[in-house]
């Protein structure tokens, strides 16, 4: 009896061991090496996607990533965690065009190439119903080889906003009379369309705001019921006007600027730029400036200014409840570059808001995407934050367009 019992026990143990060996091991989320405030943590949910630009997360938690270079012939990747274990276990790729803009609402996924805005219908589970036949919302957008991205925003009234950057840094070559820039009718602004009307032409749009050299990061603020936009500043002061400026000046100015935009707003490019140290709008040298002369006061005053060359590529107003109260309704900003003035950058910043207005200065929220010491670099940056999105649980997602890494940042008060 005893021998039979031992034999049966051994067989059961052997079978159990074999089953354990044949069952796939649970895949643990990869911890991201970012510097965060206490209580926050970050994981890598995807990597090696390539030029991952803007991102959007559906109410079901699916992460949509827009690529600026095709990967396996596709420009949109949908990443799903179907068993909710914190790791991506399903990937669907579609769209044969590159671009930057992407957003998702209850019924549709919107995505842009540099010339066209597309729309995909979603089913009740917020899955794209037909990946091969998107609807065309806007076509014929101005696109050049430089700064051709078309980021997107939709407001509560179903207006679609498309940012169209200037392909000229200061409109110097295009301005023949030394007084007026002829590009402002077609670029350097934000155009408004109907988010539900098909086959609109660029000319059907309304120029909502102008004088914005290049906007990548912008977002609708539901509290103030207004559009906020971040401008990429110009450059090349000392190279074109060495009689007035040196290399240090070019590294320090102009500020990257945040604006609250109402219909008809004019931020002043190319005629002015902003000095964030003296808090003044200065006349651009192409139009008679010398680094001291002030620009016309009629141009919009920035809501907030940041050091030069940080490259604000995305903006998100946080409406979740996962993060502490301090972050509620505040703005997260993805900085895609670095400030020579501060030796900081390649980070996600935060600006506190209350009643739809900034209530304090900006601070770095998530750092060390670069993976190097920016004061004493030993090589190039490893990652560059480019897109931001909020998940249904309140988690913050960040895309990197250098390696194609997607980060998920969460908060747990217990650490």
Give the positions of each predicted feature.
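Beta-propeller domain segments
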Residues: 26-38, 149, 166-203, 212-214, ...
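Beta-strand-rich domains and repeat architectures in extracellular enzymes and scaffolds
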Residues: 43-68, 311-317, 333, 337
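Surface loop/turn motifs at the tips and blade-to-blade linkers of beta-strand repeat domains
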Residues: 45-49, 92-97, 137-144, 206-211, ...
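Residue-level detector of Asp-centered blade-edge/turn motifs that repeat once per structural unit
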Residues: 57-60, 104-106, 154-157, 219-224, ...
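Conserved beta-propeller blade signature
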Residues: 62-66, 108-111, 159-163, 226-230, ...
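Acidic, glycine-anchored loop motifs typical of Ca2+
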Residues: 84-90, 124-127
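Asp-box/WD-like beta-propeller blade repeats and closely related beta-sheet repeat scaffolds
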Residues: 99, 115-155
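Blade-level signature of beta-propeller repeat domains, shared across WD40, Kelch, NHL, RCC1
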Residues: 389-415
């Amino acid at each position: 009896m005893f021998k039979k019992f031992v034999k049966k026990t051994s067989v059961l143990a052997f079978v159990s061991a074999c089953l354990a060996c044949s069952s796939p091991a649970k895949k643990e989320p990869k911890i991201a090496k970012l510097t965060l405030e206490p209580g926050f943590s970050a994981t890598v949910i995807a990597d090696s996607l390539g030029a991952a630009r803007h991102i959007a997360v559906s109410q079901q938690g699916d992460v949509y990533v827009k690529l600026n270079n095709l990967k396996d012939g596709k420009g949109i990747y949908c990443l799903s965690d179907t068993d909710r274990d914190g790791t991506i276990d399903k990937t669907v790729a579609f769209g044969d065009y590159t671009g930057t803009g992407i957003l998702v609402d209850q019924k549709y996924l919107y995505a842009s190439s540099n010339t066209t805005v597309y729309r995909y219908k979603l089913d009740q589970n917020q899955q794209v119903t037909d990946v091969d036949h998107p609807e065309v919302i806007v076509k014929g957008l101005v696109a050049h080889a430089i700064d051709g991205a078309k980021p997107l925003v939709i407001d509560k009234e179903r207006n679609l906003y498309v940012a169209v950057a200037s392909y000229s840094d200061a409109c110097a070559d295009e301005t023949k009379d030394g007084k007026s820039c002829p590009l402002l009718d077609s670029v350097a602004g934000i155009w408004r369309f109907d988010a539900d009307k098909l086959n609109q032409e660029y000319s059907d749009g309304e120029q909502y705001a102008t004088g914005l050299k290049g906007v990548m990061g912008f977002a609708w603020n539901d509290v103030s019921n207004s559009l906020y936009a971040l401008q990429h500043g110009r450059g090349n002061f000392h190279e074109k006007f060495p009689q007035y400026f040196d290399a240090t000046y070019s590294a320090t100015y102009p500020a990257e600027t945040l604006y609250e935009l109402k219909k008809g707003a004019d931020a002043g490019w190319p005629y002015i730029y902003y000095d964030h140290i003296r808090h003044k709008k200065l006349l651009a040298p192409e139009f008679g400036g010398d680094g001291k002369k002030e620009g016309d006061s009629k141009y919009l005053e920035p809501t907030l200014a940041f050091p030069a060359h940080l490259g604000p590529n995305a903006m998100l107003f946080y409406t979740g409840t996962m993060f502490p109260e301090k972050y509620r309704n505040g703005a997260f900003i993805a900085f895609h570059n670095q400030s020579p003035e501060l030796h900081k950058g390649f980070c996600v910043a935060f600006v506190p808001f209350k009643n739809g207005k900034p209530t304090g200065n900006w601070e770095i929220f998530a750092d060390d995407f670069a993976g190097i010491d920016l004061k004493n670099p030993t090589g190039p940056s490893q990652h560059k934050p480019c897109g931001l999105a909020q998940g249904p649980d309140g988690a913050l997602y960040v895309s990197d367009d250098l390696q194609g890494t997607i980060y998920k940042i969460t908060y747990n008060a217990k650490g």
